[in-house]
A protein has these predicted regions:
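Short, contiguous pre-domain boundary segments
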Residues: 16-31
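Short hydrophobic/aromatic-rich motifs at helix boundaries and adjacent loops
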Residues: 18-19, 38-42, 127-130
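Conserved N-terminal diphosphate/IPP-binding helix and adjacent helical/loop segment
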Residues: 29-45
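Cofactor-binding active-site loop characterized by glycine-rich and histidine/acidic residues
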Residues: 32, 63-137
């Protein structure tokens, strides 16, 4: 653990991550510890999925994790028990390289994706192709 006192703000870094710098936005948004842990989990799932397959683009999925989580949990109208519901909001991500952002949120949101699906990212016949498709996922 190290302390940085060179700036106006004193930060304590734990495992390379500053707690002081990483939490203020979450606090302003009214997020609790569970929300922060969910976003951290989404980031780790994205990194792990790309590591497992050996190629891909984890950066965008990791950086979009807070936005995607906020939309999925607090903004979008949807029902995991009825994914074909006509009245649901749709999450359209024009950046196909970040399909992993969508897959992680579907996994965390209870839409039927399992950890094994994330682990089979970008493999032939998987539920999680490298670029989003209409029916597999």
């Amino acid at each position: 653990m190290s302390t940085n006192t060179t700036s106006k703000r004193t930060t304590t870094a734990t495992q390379g991550r500053s707690q002081e710098i990483s939490r203020p936005v979450a606090r302003k948004a009214g997020w609790g510890d569970l929300d922060v842990r969910a976003v951290d989990t989404a980031r780790l799932l994205a990194a792990d999925a790309v590591q497992k397959v050996g190629n891909g683009h984890p950066g965008t999925a990791m950086s979009l994790a807070p936005v995607a989580y906020l939309l999925q949990q607090n903004v979008m109208t949807h029902d995991p028990s009825d994914p074909a519901w006509l009245g649901r909001d749709r999450f359209v991500l024009s950046c196909g390289h970040s399909s992993l952002t969508l897959y992680v949120q579907l996994f965390l949101g209870g839409y039927g994706l399992e950890l094994k699906d994330l682990k089979s990212l970008r493999t032939w016949g998987s539920q999680t192709p490298g670029h989003p498709e209409v029916h597999p996922t």
